[in-house]
Regions:
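Short, polar/charged alpha-helical segment
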Residues: 55-66, 76-98
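Extracytoplasmic ligand-binding site segments that recognize negatively charged/polar headgroups
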Residues: 72-88, 100-116, 122-259
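N-terminal low-complexity, Pro/Thr/Ser-rich intrinsically disordered segments
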Residues: 33-68
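A ligand-binding cleft/hinge motif common to bilobed small-molecule-binding domains
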Residues: 134-139, 256, 262-282
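Sec-dependent bacterial lipoprotein signal peptides
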Residues: 1-21
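Extracytoplasmic/periplasmic substrate-recognition and gating elements
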Residues: 277-306
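Short amphipathic alpha-helical segments
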Residues: 69-71, 172, 296-300
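Bacterial lipoprotein signal-peptidase II cleavage site
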Residues: 6, 19-36
C-alpha cells in the first residue's frame, strides 16, 4: 500500500502523458459548469469536528444529520460495488435524510472538481469515493475526520491526519463479450482487427482509479513495473494505432450496445456486468492475470467545505 501511494503521488505526470498521447486529449472540462446550488450557511460545529467525540454520541451525529436533512453524494453507480443496495439501506435506516445523487459516472478528479465548482452551495458533494491516485494528491480539499473505526484501520490504508481512508478493493481484470469475440488469452490478442474501436479503459487514467489501474495492469503484462511505466504507454499506443482503442466512457449502456465490447475494470464491476448481460442472453467473461495482480483500494473522504 505504501508503494502504491508513492506511485500514485509520483506518476500522475507520466499517466497524463499517456492519456494525451495514447488515448487522445479531450478539451471538455466538466468542472467548468457554472455553480447551480443555493448558497448555504456552514454549521461551525460540524465543520470543525474531527471525530465522533466532537458531536457527542452517534445519536447526536444522526440528529445533526437529520436536522440538515440531505446528503449529497457523487460518482456512486448503483451497479458499482453494490452501491445501489448500500444507498437503499441508508434510506431505510435514515428516512429523514434525503440523498441527492450527482453524476454517477464521474471520475475521481471530476468529483473533487465538483466540490470546488459548487463550493459554499447546497449542490456541493458532501463526501467522495476516490481512487488512490486522486485521493493522495488532493488532501487539501478534504476535512480531517477520523471515523468511529479509525483505530481498526491499518496505518497503510489511511491518511495519518484523517483526510481519507481505504474501504473496499478488487482485482483489475479484462472483461469481454465472449459470444462475439471468443476467448482472450493475452493482451496481445486485443490488437486483432476484430476488436476495432471497442477496447476501453473505464475512464481516463489521470482522473479515474479504474482506468489508472487498468493502465498498470497492461504495463505489468508488457514488462513494466512500479518504476517503469513506458511499456504500458507503448502498448496503448499500439492499440490506438491498430484502431482498437476507444475513449468512450464505459457505462451499462455502452456495454449493452456493444460499443465497449472489451473493458479493463475491477472484478466486482465485471461480476455485475456478467449478471446483467446473462439476463439478456449475452455471455460476458472476465479474467485476471497471475503475472499482474493489480489491486488498489478506493477511499472515502469528506469535502472540507461541506
Amino acid at each position: 500500500m505504501i508503494s502504491l501511494r508513492k506511485l500514485a503521488a509520483g506518476s500522475l505526470a507520466a499517466v497524463l502523458a499517456f492519456s494525451m498521447a495514447a488515448c487522445g486529449s479531450d478539451s471538455t472540462d466538466s468542472s467548468a459548469d457554472s455553480t447551480s446550488g443555493k448558497v448555504v450557511k456552514v454549521d461551525e460545529k460540524s465543520a470543525k469536528a474531527t471525530s465522533l467525540a466532537d458531536f457527542g454520541t452517534m445519536d447526536d451525529l444522526v440528529a445533526a444529520a437529520e436536522k440538515e436533512g440531505q446528503l449529497n453524494v457523487i460518482a456512486l453507480p448503483h451497479n458499482w460495488s453494490n452501491y445501489g443496495e448500500v444507498i437503499n439501506g441508508f434510506k431505510k435506516k435514515y428516512p429523514k435524510i434525503k440523498i441527492n445523487e450527482q453524476n454517477p459516472n464521474a471520475s475521481s478528479k471530476e468529483e473533487v472538481d465538483a466540490g470546488k465548482t459548487n463550493k459554499g452551495t447546497d449542490a456541493a458533494p458532501d463526501v467522495y469515493d476516490l481512487g488512490l491516485a486522486v485521493a493522495s494528491t488532493s488532501t487539501d480539499n478534504f476535512a480531517s475526520y477520523k471515523v468511529q473505526a479509525w483505530d481498526k484501520i491499518p496505518d497503510t490504508a489511511k491518511d495519518a491526519d484523517g483526510a481519507y481512508y481505504a474501504d473496499y478493493t478488487g482485482i483489475m481484470s479484462v472483461g469481454w463479450n465472449a459470444d462475439k469475440y471468443g476467448d482472450i488469452s493475452s493482451l496481445d490478442d486485443l490488437l486483432d482487427p476484430k476488436f476495432a474501436g471497442t477496447v476501453a479503459l473505464n475512464g481516463k487514467p489521470a482522473e479515474a482509479g479504474a482506468a489508472f489501474n487498468g493502465y498498470l495492469l497492461a504495463n505489468q503484462l508488457a514488462g513494466g513495473d512500479i518504476n517503469n511505466l513506458q511499456p504500458g504507454l507503448d502498448y496503448f499506443k499500439k492499440l490506438k494505432e491498430a484502431g482498437n482503442l476507444t475513449t468512450v466512457d464505459v457505462t451499462n449502456g455502452t456495454i449493452d450496445s456493444g460499443q465497449t465490447g472489451v473493458v479493463f475494470d475491477w472484478t466486482y464491476n465485471q461480476a455485475s456486468y456478467k449478471k446483467e448481460l446473462k439476463d439478456k442472453g449475452v455471455n460476458w467473461k472476465y479474467k485476471t492475470f497471475p503475472k499482474a495482480q493489480v489491486v488498489s483500494y478506493y477511499n472515502q473522504a469528506i469535502n472540507k467545505d461541506a
